[in-house]
């Protein structure tokens, strides 16, 4: 259910603040968003997969916390990120 290395590298390259940046909130949120979108496709066919649903809810919660952190630190970066990812908020 995880993303492959090429997809992760592409996401990191797109959202990184500088070279080799994998820890910034933008990169972490983008990776979590890609994983969440991947799992949502999984649930279209596997409606009763409750174990994976719990993992999905943990990812959503983690993404929410990172977005709240980023909003508190730098609201312009937060607004730019949710616009780029197409998230509601």
Curated annotation (Swiss-Prot):
<comment type="subunit">
    <text>Part of the 30S ribosomal subunit. Forms a bridge to the 50S subunit in the 70S ribosome, contacting the 23S rRNA.</text>
</comment>
<keyword id="KW-0687">Ribonucleoprotein</keyword>
<dbReference type="InterPro" id="IPR005290">
    <property type="entry name" value="Ribosomal_uS15_bac-type"/>
</dbReference>
<keyword id="KW-0699">rRNA-binding</keyword>
<keyword id="KW-0689">Ribosomal protein</keyword>
<comment type="function">
    <text>One of the primary rRNA binding proteins, it binds directly to 16S rRNA where it helps nucleate assembly of the platform of the 30S subunit by binding and bridging several RNA helices of the 16S rRNA.</text>
</comment>
<dbReference type="GO" id="GO:0003735">
    <property type="term" value="F:structural constituent of ribosome"/>
</dbReference>
<protein>
    <recommendedName>
        <fullName>Small ribosomal subunit protein uS15</fullName>
    </recommendedName>
</protein>
<dbReference type="InterPro" id="IPR000589">
    <property type="entry name" value="Ribosomal_uS15"/>
</dbReference>
<dbReference type="GO" id="GO:0022627">
    <property type="term" value="C:cytosolic small ribosomal subunit"/>
</dbReference>
<dbReference type="GO" id="GO:0006412">
    <property type="term" value="P:translation"/>
</dbReference>
<keyword id="KW-0694">RNA-binding</keyword>
<dbReference type="GO" id="GO:0019843">
    <property type="term" value="F:rRNA binding"/>
</dbReference>
<comment type="function">
    <text>Forms an intersubunit bridge (bridge B4) with the 23S rRNA of the 50S subunit in the ribosome.</text>
</comment>
<dbReference type="InterPro" id="IPR009068">
    <property type="entry name" value="uS15_NS1_RNA-bd_sf"/>
</dbReference>
<comment type="similarity">
    <text>Belongs to the universal ribosomal protein uS15 family.</text>
</comment>
<dbReference type="Pfam" id="PF00312">
    <property type="entry name" value="Ribosomal_S15"/>
</dbReference>
């Amino acid at each position: 259910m995880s993303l492959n290395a090429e997809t992760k590298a592409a996401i990191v390259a797109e959202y990184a603040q500088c070279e080799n940046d994998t820890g910034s909130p933008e990169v972490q949120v983008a990776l979590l968003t890609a994983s969440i979108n991947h799992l949502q496709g999984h649930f279209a066919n596997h409606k009763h997969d409750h174990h994976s649903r719990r993992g999905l809810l943990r990812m959503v919660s983690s993404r929410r916390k990172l977005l709240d952190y980023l909003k508190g630190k730098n609201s312009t970066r937060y607004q730019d990120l949710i616009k780029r990812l197409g998230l509601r908020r």
